[in-house]
């Protein structure tokens, strides 16, 4: 069957074009993971009995004292995968989409050495991307006893958080007011973007130093640094002085810098009553304006419904339509000139403003010592850290965490990153570059394909007008197939190499072996019966025919 031949050709062409655009990854020798020798209060690479160290939580989540939901999200440890994966490396994976997840690790002994650097570092890989969800961790202010939840207090929250256009890396710490004993959150004021991309690992590092400075690094690069005193909202230290809340502005205090000129007089020619808009005095009614014709008329084709009851429903009134005469002419009904801006409009008059001779200045309450003021030279003294917890919501599954470091050595954290992150960096960045390149190439190919298809249809419209009806009907089927499945259509066009050649090839392929009568405008009864049978077959097997092998049909037998 010739339709099968062309369909199979189209399929091969499509596969050929796809294959020519594909860029298969070259096979590379997998990198091998070696457990680090770095030591710290926490160096977690999820080897061995990880489930004895990390306890998933099944606690209830409460918001404003009301139970919201349970932490039902599943946690697993899985070997790394992807182009940059280290063979044998494992990571903690947040598995479920649209779910709350919570898990925690408790230190053998609380960490509380404020005279040393505090370094927090870990890797995050959103294997399927992260459009809305958190990937930050918390350094905990109390033991969890395996029941991590939003009610467990924390000292520091650090890491990426992304939802829609909000994309940032958090650094939040809690500071204790020495006067009241209360803790308040201090948020980093200018938060860097997370740089999260599907299947790409990022390394996040936080360094807090005893001199009250900090650094946030992403992939080893310092993206934010500053002072615990000056770069957080609200500030750590309250103001030394505040405005006196009991101070009152004197009654004779003049704080208006300008006043209306008391000597100004409204000009005699100032017309406050002049309208803002006036009819255009130069406008002329169009000659074809039908002033006696109504704009709307009853619809002459409207019919009273059969079930309309005048006694119950009232008098039936047909719907109205725009008067056709009004559409043909310039307009109908009473003609009015268009409105224009009044050149003489000036609006209400008001005297000009002049400097106020009695102006004293803007009034402020006097300053008094802040009764709530306190000083703290060491906001980096966060207090004892009892463990690490993840308490997260995510809309995407399979968020991977690996190579977690919590300790006091910047050098050791860098060494760990060199061992685990840098080997993945090159391979994953090559993948990212390849993905971006293929996306650009795909956009370019799609644009060219659309242009080719548009030209093809333009040429076909010209030729179709000269084709006999029975021929045009058959060719139409294939043109519709090209439009509905442009991959096949563009492949055929690309292989044949010429838009005109495509149409002529289709024409002669189908009809060169047919009898002259089949190209004439007349059609015999036998041919009509044959065409109707073919039409029914193609309609019932339309999906199958584009990928069907060559088969016989009554039409094919007659043509062969």
UniProtKB/Swiss-Prot annotation:
One of its GO terms (molecular function) is carbohydrate binding. Residues 242-375 are annotated as: P domain (Extended arm). The modification Phosphothreonine is found at residues 551, 555. Glycans are attached at residue 418. GO terms for cellular component: endoplasmic reticulum; endoplasmic reticulum membrane; fungal-type vacuole; membrane. Keywords: Calcium, Chaperone, Disulfide bond, Endoplasmic reticulum, Glycoprotein, Lectin, Membrane, Phosphoprotein, Repeat, Signal, Transmembrane, Transmembrane helix. Residues 244-310, 314-371 are annotated as: 4 X approximate repeats. Residues 1-22 form the signal peptide. Pfam families: Calreticulin. The chain crosses the membrane at residues 490-512. PROSITE patterns: CALRETICULIN_1, CALRETICULIN_2, CALRETICULIN_REPEAT. Residues 253-273, 517-560 are annotated as: Disordered. Residues 525-544 have a biased composition (Basic and acidic residues). Residues 513-560 are cytoplasmic. Calcium-binding protein that interacts with newly synthesized monoglucosylated glycoproteins in the endoplasmic reticulum. It may act in assisting protein assembly and/or in the retention within the ER of unassembled protein subunits. It seems to play a major role in the quality control apparatus of the ER by the retention of incorrectly folded proteins. This is Calnexin homolog. The lineage of its organism: Eukaryota, Fungi, Dikarya, Ascomycota, Taphrinomycotina. The gene is cal1.
């Amino acid at each position: 069957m010739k339709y099968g031949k062309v369909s199979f050709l189209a399929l091969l062409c499509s596969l050929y074009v796809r294959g020519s655009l594909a860029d298969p990854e070259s096979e590379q020798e997998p990198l091998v993971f070696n457990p680090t020798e770095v030591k710290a209060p926490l160096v977690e690479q999820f080897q061995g009995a990880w489930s004895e160290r990390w306890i998933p939580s099944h606690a209830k989540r409460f918001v404003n004292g009301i139970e919201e939901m349970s932490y039902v999200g599943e946690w697993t440890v899985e070997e790394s995968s992807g182009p940059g994966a280290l063979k044998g490396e494992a990571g903690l994976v947040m598995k479920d989409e649209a779910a709350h997840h919570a898990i925690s690790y408790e230190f053998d002994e609380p960490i509380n050495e404020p005279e040393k650097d505090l370094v927090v570092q870990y890797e995050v890989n959103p294997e399927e991307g992260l459009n809305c969800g958190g990937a930050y961790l918390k350094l905990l202010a109390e033991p969890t006893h395996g029941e991590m939840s939003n009610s467990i207090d924390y000292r520091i929250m650090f890491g990426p958080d992304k939802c829609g256009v909000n994309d940032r890396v958090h650094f939040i710490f809690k500071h204790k007011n020495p006067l009241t004993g209360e803790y308040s959150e201090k948020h980093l004021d200018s938060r860097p973007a997370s740089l999260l991309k599907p299947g790409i690992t990022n390394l996040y590092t936080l360094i807090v130093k005893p001199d009250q400075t900090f650094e946030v690094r992403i992939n080893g690069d310092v993206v934010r640094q500053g002072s615990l005193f000056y770069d957080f909202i609200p500030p750590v230290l309250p103001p030394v002085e505040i405005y006196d809340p009991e101070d009152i502005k004197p009654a004779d205090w003049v704080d208006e810098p300008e006043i209306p000129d008391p000597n100004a007089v409204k000009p005699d020619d100032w017309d406050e009553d002049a309208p803002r808009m006036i009819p255009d005095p130069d406008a002329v009614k169009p000659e074809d304006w039908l002033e006696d014709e109504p704009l709307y008329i009853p619809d002459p084709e409207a019919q009273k419904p059969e079930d309309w009851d005048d006694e119950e429903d009232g008098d039936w009134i047909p719907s109205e339509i725009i008067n056709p005469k009004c559409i043909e002419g310039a307009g109908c009904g009473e003609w009015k000139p268009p409105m224009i801006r009044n050149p003489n409009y000036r609006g209400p008059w008001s005297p000009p403003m002049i400097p106020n001779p009695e102006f004293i200045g803007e009034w402020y309450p006097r300053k008094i010592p802040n009764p709530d003021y306190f000083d703290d030279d060491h906001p980096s003294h966060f207090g004892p850290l009892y463990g690490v917890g993840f308490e997260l919501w995510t809309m995407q599954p399979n968020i991977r965490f690996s190579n977690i470091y919590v300790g006091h050595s910047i050098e050791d954290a860098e060494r760990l990153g060199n061992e685990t992150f840098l080997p993945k960096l090159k391979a994953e960045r090559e993948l990212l570059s390849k993905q971006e390149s293929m996306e650009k190439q795909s956009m370019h190919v799609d644009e060219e394909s659309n242009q080719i298809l548009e030209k093809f249809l333009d040429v076909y419209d010209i030729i179709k007008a000269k084709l006999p009806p029975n021929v045009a009907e058959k060719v139409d089927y294939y043109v519709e197939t090209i439009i509905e499945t442009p991959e096949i259509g563009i492949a055929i066009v690309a292989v044949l190499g010429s838009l005109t050649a495509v149409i002529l090839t289709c024409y002669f392929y189908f009809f060169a072996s047919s009898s002259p009568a089949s190209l004439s405008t007349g059609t015999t009864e036998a041919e009509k019966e044959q065409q109707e049978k073919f039409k029914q077959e193609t309609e019932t097997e339309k999906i199958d025919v584009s990928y069907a092998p060559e088969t016989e049909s009554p039409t094919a037998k007659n043509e062969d």
